[in-house]
């Protein structure tokens, strides 16, 4: 199948690399715009863009997801599927409905728990012993689409987001390729999420890191 991949940080790299090793054709990648970082405000490419440069993959970096020029370029890639891992932007309906076989997201939790941008951090904060990866068809809501495949991953006693995320990312890449294999074979069985069991995992703010020294 013709795949457009959308992703930005280190967490997304194993998904892209798994696609590149698969039988599918990655026809293009969408990643966040280059941004200045650090004291020197040096422009830094996203980890996903670095892989694309190494592999010679066409890249789009739209400032606005509804930009007509961007949408036209995306259509010209003629994707069968858009695969998304930690892209960092909400996709508008014009993109969600573009590929004939749908948009598939790799999410860093066992949905419907921990919907949102910070599932790994919040699973650790809440003292979970198990988290995982869910692949799902994307819908207009925040991580509300039908689930496709799920795989549990143990949270070790000494895990931080920095140690847990790479393990989840590797599982995510493998699960994404398996999801696409089953999609092509017609053996996927999408499961609606139980909204009553849903919890949210918003992006952490600075104040979330404040230690309350009155707690023992």
Language-model-detected regions and their locations in the chain:
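N-terminal Rossmann-like dinucleotide-binding module
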Residues: 1-40
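Short beta->alpha connector loops
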Residues: 8-11, 63-66, 87-89
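Amphipathic, non-transmembrane alpha-helical secondary structure
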Residues: 13, 17-21, 71-75, 177
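Donor/substrate-binding cores of folate-linked one-carbon enzymes
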Residues: 22, 32, 81-200, 205
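N-terminal glycine-/serine-/threonine-rich beta1-alpha1-beta2 phosphate-ribose binding loop
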Residues: 32, 36-80
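Acyl-group handling in specialized metabolite and lipid biosynthesis
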Residues: 202-215
């Amino acid at each position: 199948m013709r795949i457009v991949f959308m992703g930005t940080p280190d967490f997304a790299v194993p998904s892209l690399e798994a696609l590149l090793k698969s039988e599918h054709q990655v026809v293009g990648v969408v990643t966040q715009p280059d941004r200045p970082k650090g004291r020197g405000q040096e422009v830094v490419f996203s980890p996903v863009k670095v892989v694309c440069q190494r592999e010679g993959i066409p890249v789009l970096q739209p400032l606005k997801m509804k930009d007509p020029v961007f949408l036209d370029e995306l259509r010209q890639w003629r994707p069968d599927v858009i695969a998304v891992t930690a892209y960092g932007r909400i996709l508008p309906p014009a993109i969600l409905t573009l590929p004939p076989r749908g948009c598939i997201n790799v999410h860093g939790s066992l949905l419907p728990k921990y919907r949102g941008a910070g599932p790994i951090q919040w699973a650790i904060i809440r003292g979970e012993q198990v988290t995982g990866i869910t692949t799902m068809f994307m819908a207009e809501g925040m991580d509300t689409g039908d689930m496709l495949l799920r795989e549990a991953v143990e949270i070790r006693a000494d895990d931080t987001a920095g140690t847990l995320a790479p393990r989840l990312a590797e599982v995510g890449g493998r699960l994404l390729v398996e999801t696409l294999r089953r999609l092509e074979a017609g053996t996927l069985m999408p499961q609606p999420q139980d909204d009553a069991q849903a919890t949210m995992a918003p992006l952490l703010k600075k104040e979330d890191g404040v230690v309350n020294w009155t707690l023992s």
